């Protein structure tokens, strides 16, 4: 059972990290298929082991946290995501579930456009606001950028108050043209049309958005007029109002017709001029939607059928290696650059030598690579019919960085030399990463320069960089401005929470989630350092291996000296919330909900504070709700709170309470 719990926590951390990358940073370390597989595994494990259902699980959420660049706006009606199915068998289960609840229903199929979901508000027929999905409850105001979309009407033919939703995307033609321009200007290329569209919508200068030729398809109306009774009539009414609507929607009467429509979409999907990764299937009759209902994440009356993964053929030019901070040596295949779904792919992670051996991958082999919405591809198979005189790949025996003999452990090869330069650089890079000390001005290449010039050798040296001010400023590509930015960022990072510092130390098995728990439990580095294995094992999330790894880290004299140095350098090694123990029970076991926009906190920050103080975040008001935290522009939750006589806290009252 301990392994099950660890797996669930791993999946939660991995998916939450990916959600943040995807929804907030417009990037992703997982492709769609990998993400979907992890998400489905988590759903399965949570249903089978309900005792390990955590309130911070991504299965209870819609998307990711909100970016801080734009003004926030609360959605009057949540922008839910869709559940996915990946084959006909799963689709049949969806169809049968519907059939058991209602009869005489029809379906409408629409193309699933791979872009960025937006909600548009019109007042008296004039476009007033455009908002991203955000976390599903609150998005970003991107009105000026959306107004640059040429086919979008800024004024309707009728003076209606209307909220419509759709998908902003970039055509392949516009995407390729944009990347050609960026290449000429020596700028980094966008990975795919979706990233280009997302990045464009988040431009602070709408002139940039106007130059990039975005497009949009509208697909629904929030609270449609009473005369509209089907999804098909929604699309027809949107067309009447001269909104751009994707014309590849199909009216479906039964299961047999649905299968035929899927075959039709499979045939046309590669000839559209824009990226689509599936089909959205909805119950056509709007009156049935409330009967079938919703989960907290998605409607039960709609499903997304994902197309089979696209694949392409390319050549392996070479197999190189990279070393991680733990010493693990990973082989990387360098590919003849190829485009899959609009993304340029030039490298593939080959994981380990056993993986290469199992697939019999060789330099100069032709391989099939697949990808679904990410720049990280996977080799499906080697095309052995095209193989000529390629020789089997041999694993290196010594570290390419320090020439230390590699040790094989399970399926992986490791360099255990503590002085390996490449490992040290990766340790530095991990320490400054966003989840750790978040020093984003120190990228990998900058760290390499500082390391090889002898200015830094380990993570504590970063905070003594000021002694080399003159020398660093004289380096090519640095200068006074860059150096000052580095020093300012380093000083700012000294005030990070203990949990960030614990992540940066790179203790084995201590990731984001466990670091936060350790910081909360022990409150400062000294208490954690003194903790026994027995006291560590009393924490639900910690097993025997993790406890031993934590204890061994703090028994190492080298690590203790490092921590002492950090203390002398003035880093915060305390958990922020430990300064006032009285407040630790303020929200204990209390059900808390938010409405409106807070001025001093993002929704995500405020919710995390409540969770840290023992509270439970809920998404809808019931008579068992304890607190409603009220921001500006509140939604209908305020009326419901008054109806149930629930205690309402203004933002300043909330702030006083948590101080």
Curated annotation (Swiss-Prot):
Q: Which SUPFAM superfamilies match?
A: BRCT domain (SSF52113), DNA ligase/mRNA capping enzyme, catalytic domain (SSF56091), Nucleic acid-binding proteins (SSF50249), RuvA domain 2-like (SSF47781)
Q: Name the domain of life.
A: Bacteria
Query: Per UniProt, where does Zn(2+) bind?
Result: 399, 402, 415, 420
Cofactor(s) named in the record: Mg(2+); Mn(2+)
Keywords linked to the UniProt accession:
DNA damage, DNA repair, DNA replication, Ligase, Magnesium, Manganese, Metal-binding, NAD, Zinc
PROSITE patterns in alphabetical order: BRCT, DNA_LIGASE_N1
Q: Which reaction does it catalyse?
A: NAD(+) + (deoxyribonucleotide)n-3'-hydroxyl + 5'-phospho-(deoxyribonucleotide)m = (deoxyribonucleotide)n+m + AMP + beta-nicotinamide D-nucleotide
Q: Where is the active site?
A: 112 (n6-amp-lysine intermediate)
Residues given in the record as NAD(+) binding sites = 32-36, 81-82, 110, 133, 167, 282, 306
- Which Pfam families does the annotation name? BRCT, DNA_ligase_aden, DNA_ligase_OB, HHH_2
DNA repair in keyword set: yes
Residue span, BRCT domain: 582-659
Q: What is its EC number?
A: 6.5.1.2
Keyword match Transmembrane? no
Broad enzyme group:
ligase
Spell out the HAMAP family in the cross-references. DNA_ligase_A
Per the record, the similarity remark reads: Belongs to the NAD-dependent DNA ligase family. LigA subfamily.
Question: Which PANTHER family did the record assign?
Answer: CHROMOSOME TRANSMISSION FIDELITY FACTOR 18 (PTHR23389), DNA LIGASE (PTHR23389:SF9)
The name on file for this protein is DNA ligase
Gene from which the chain derives: ligA
